[in-house]
């Protein structure tokens, strides 16, 4: 969570964070309910961090009514988690919805992350690329021309470790594939762009 995101969520829900670092004998558990600290202390815990959010906007009905249907919100969260897995492919993620495991990544690199998110068939239809120009490195996977999709949902761009949406990159890749695509088809890719930090505005 970046900046004030986690405390903002904790101010309108019940949040439980359990974390243990490598080398620590015990983990730490922190529970906040609508901004009020309920519990803070040591506990036995596996390595890593889990964040549980419950009763979002339960005490603010005016905000809660603006939430979309449960499935819509779930799909939006699942989409974001999938991008986190791809962006941080050396970190393992376990994502569950209603006690059902949706993603369980191994943290074993790009190919493993792609297979976790999209499946083995997807990975087998991708072409690995790598290009370096001065201080700029572009690498990742693009689809074989025969493996296009009917939406842009399978396009992922990671810039300096962050998932970003960029229409210019999407349009450029589309231009390269256009002559191979049927109507309303789009290329699919997982691209990692690393460049000097002063080249981009993280906001």
Where are the language model's segments positioned?
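N-terminal phosphate-binding caps/lids of nucleotide- and nucleic-acid-binding domains
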Residues: 1-203
């Amino acid at each position: 969570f970046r900046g004030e995101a986690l405390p903002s969520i904790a101010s309108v829900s019940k949040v439980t964070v359990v974390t243990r670092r490598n080398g620590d004998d015990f983990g730490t558990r922190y529970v906040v309910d609508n901004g009020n600290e309920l519990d803070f202390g040591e506990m036995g815990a596996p390595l890593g961090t889990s964040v549980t959010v419950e009763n979002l906007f339960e005490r603010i009905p005016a905000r809660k009514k603006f939430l979309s249907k449960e499935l819509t919100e779930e799909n939006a969260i699942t989409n974001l988690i999938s991008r986190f897995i791809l962006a941080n492919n050396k970190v393992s993620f376990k994502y569950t919805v209603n006690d059902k495991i949706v993603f369980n990544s191994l943290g074993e690199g790009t190919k493993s992350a792609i297979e976790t998110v999209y499946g083995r068939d997807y990975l087998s239809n991708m072409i690995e690329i790598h290009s370096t120009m001065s201080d700029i490195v572009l690498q990742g996977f693009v689809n074989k021309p025969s493996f296009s999709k009917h939406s842009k949902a399978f396009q992922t761009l990671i810039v300096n470790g962050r998932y970003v949406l960029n229409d210019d990159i999407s349009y450029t890749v589309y231009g390269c594939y256009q002559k191979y695509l049927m109507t309303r088809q789009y290329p699919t890719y997982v691209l990692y762009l690393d460049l000097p930090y002063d080249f981009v505005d993280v906001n």
